């Protein structure tokens, strides 16, 4: 591949920014300064250094985030902070984007990547990738509600939801903690399904997306690359 593309893929900047780095003689390939971005390199076998530091080539990156409330799942927004504002600028330069979306007031697992093919597989309605949410609900969820979820909730606008699983973890006189397993992703779906049962979601967290589980050691707003095991589980999830 071309050296300038390799450097751009490594997050060193746009093609024009990379051109400036080359012109400034800050890039070496196998010990020799290279100023021409058209030079062909093999990132697997050639030693490419930027200011003396070895560059690790990764075409695709995969990041798990524990998304906090108050941040939108978008690449840009004129009113609110986005999830990209919370990650290393190096990933931003690699063109990562959130896979799907969590509402601004929902927190929990969010995957970010620049792998469009994987994102498409995870979001495709045909794949029915299961996502698990935990919700704190104002009101007492009942076994009758669980049966309605299993049958398929009809939303207030007449939209029919696919059958879903509702697990009631605990209840008090006026509140419930539940987990909801969904295989689709309609707008505000969890909140609307609970509302159809006459209750209100007051806190919502996503725990899983397919085989990927939220790392509980991640604080809100923190992120980390996926482990090889996590990545392989996503790649093999059909």
Q: Which ranges hold each PLM region?
A:
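Basic, flexible Lys/Arg- and Gly-enriched helix-loop patches that mediate nucleic-acid binding at interfaces
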Residues: 1-238
């Amino acid at each position: 591949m071309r050296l300038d593309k390799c450097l751009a893929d490594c997050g060193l900047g746009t093609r024009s920014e990379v051109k400036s780095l080359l012109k400034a003689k800050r890039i070496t390939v196998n010990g020799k300064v290279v100023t021409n971005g058209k030079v062909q390199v093999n990132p697997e076998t050639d030693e490419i250094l930027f200011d003396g530091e070895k560059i690790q080539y990764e075409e695709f990156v995969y990041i798990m985030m524990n998304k906090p409330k108050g941040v939108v799942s978008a690449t840009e927004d004129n009113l609110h902070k986005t999830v990209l504002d919370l990650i290393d600028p190096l990933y931003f330069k690699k063109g990562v984007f959130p896979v799907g979306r969590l509402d601004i007031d929902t927190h929990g697992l969010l995957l970010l990547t620049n792998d469009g093919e994987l994102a498409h597989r995870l979001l495709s309605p045909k794949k029915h990738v299961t996502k698990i949410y935990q919700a704190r609900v104002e009101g007492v969820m009942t076994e009758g509600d669980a049966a309605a979820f299993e049958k398929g909730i009809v939303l207030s606008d007449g939209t029919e939801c696919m059958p879903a699983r509702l697990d009631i973890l605990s209840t008090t006189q006026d509140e419930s903690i539940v987990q909801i397993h969904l295989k689709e992703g309609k707008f505000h779906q969890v909140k609307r399904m609970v509302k159809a049962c006459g209750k209100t979601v007051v806190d919502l967290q996503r725990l899983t997306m397919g085989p990927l589980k939220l790392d509980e050691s991640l604080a809100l707003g923190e992120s980390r690359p996926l482990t090889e095991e996590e990545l392989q589980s996503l790649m093999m999830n059909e």
